[in-house]
Amino acid sequence: MADEQDAAGEQPVFQIQRVYLKDLSLEQPNSPQILIEQGQPAVDVNLGIEVQPIADGVFEVAVSATVTTKLGERTLFLCEAKQAGIFEIRNIDADQMQPILGIACPGIVYPYLRAVVADIISRAGFPPVHLAEVNFQAMYEAQQQSGAQQLNS
């Protein structure tokens, strides 16, 4: 019986504790004048991932997006959002921990971020910007290669 408890204690644990909106802002610095101008706006999207340990075996993983939309040289709107999740991750091999934090966790949080960004932009009176699907595995692998290249330089 004690052996069963020890074996159960060694089982890998991956649990989502909470997903929440950590930060959100939308600015229209040139309103209302820019709203009557005609033209095709240019949309620029930047994504980021942050990982913070918050307790033993508990991590906060945040995915952020900055959406900048310009009409010519003037900003139509700027949306910044950060969606985060708290994950309990225990009894995982060290070589598997970074991919879980860099691929699996952002993949869970990102759909919430996409919905928030589209919603806030449409509530501001603009057509929603639907963030593209992201291959977090490819992003993680590119980041790993970039880091390895910097170490070799």
UniProtKB/Swiss-Prot annotation:
Please give the SUPFAM superfamilies that the UniProt record associates with this protein.
SecB-like
Superkingdom of source: Bacteria
Note the SS bond partners: none
**A Gene Ontology BP annotation from the UniProt entry:** protein transport
> Quick one: a GO cellular component term?
cytoplasm
Which Pfam families does its entry note?
Answer: SecB
Keywords for this entry? Chaperone, Cytoplasm, Protein transport, Translocation, Transport
Q: Which GO terms describe its molecular function?
A: unfolded protein binding
Compartment(s) where it occurs, according to its Swiss-Prot or TrEMBL record: Cytoplasm
Q: Which family does it belong to?
A: Belongs to the SecB family.
Primary role: One of the proteins required for the normal export of preproteins out of the cell cytoplasm. It is a molecular chaperone that binds to a subset of precursor proteins, maintaining them in a translocation-competent state. It also specifically binds to its receptor SecA.
- Give the multimer and partner information: Homotetramer, a dimer of dimers. One homotetramer interacts with 1 SecA dimer.
Q: What is this protein called?
A: Protein-export protein SecB
